[in-house]
Amino acid sequence: MIALIQRVKRASVSVDNTIVGKIDQGLLVLLGIEREDNIEKMVKLATKVINYRVFSDEDGKMNLNLAQVGGQLLVVSQFTLAADTGKGLRPSFSCAATPEQADRLYLAFVEYCRQQGVMTQTGQFGADMQVELVNDGPVTFNLQV
């Protein structure tokens, strides 16, 4: 399971020119789910995302997590993160989860974050989405479990 997280001042995701998810300060999470992923991996990654210290403290050091800054999450499914790009000039998605498995784990990730008290918005699983964001930094991390 892969989470490409970006610290943002604000972000939104639209489907058919309609905003379906929108946050202010927080993290945009592009979530890629692979065939070998399961609930245990989801909990581990969601916990890491929520607690990852990527926000600056009073000394300008990345030392604060999402809750400590009152941040929000915008979680967007992105199966292309599971691509194998090692060979040739075309990505292979053989490592990506099936749509059914990915949807189940995506929804579980979102629900887990909400249960932890994090205000969490989402995109629409499987849809063609447009994501807009204002990067803060930019600060981007690729987290994997």
UniProtKB/Swiss-Prot annotation:
This is D-aminoacyl-tRNA deacylase. One of its GO terms (molecular function) is tRNA binding. It is found in: Cytoplasm. Homodimer. Its EC number is 3.1.1.96. InterPro entries: Daa-tRNA_deacyls_DTD, DTD-like_sf. It catalyses: glycyl-tRNA(Ala) + H2O = tRNA(Ala) + glycine + H(+); a D-aminoacyl-tRNA + H2O = a tRNA + a D-alpha-amino acid + H(+). A motif (Gly-cisPro motif, important for rejection of L-amino acids) lies at residues 137-138. One of its GO terms (cellular component) is cytoplasm. Gene3D superfamilies: D-tyrosyl-tRNA(Tyr) deacylase. A Gly-cisPro motif from one monomer fits into the active site of the other monomer to allow specific chiral rejection of L-amino acids. Belongs to the DTD family. An aminoacyl-tRNA editing enzyme that deacylates mischarged D-aminoacyl-tRNAs. Also deacylates mischarged glycyl-tRNA(Ala), protecting cells against glycine mischarging by AlaRS. Acts via tRNA-based rather than protein-based catalysis; rejects L-amino acids rather than detecting D-amino acids in the active site. By recycling D-aminoacyl-tRNA to D-amino acids and free tRNA molecules, this enzyme counteracts the toxicity associated with the formation of D-aminoacyl-tRNA entities in vivo and helps enforce protein L-homochirality. It comes from the Bacteria.
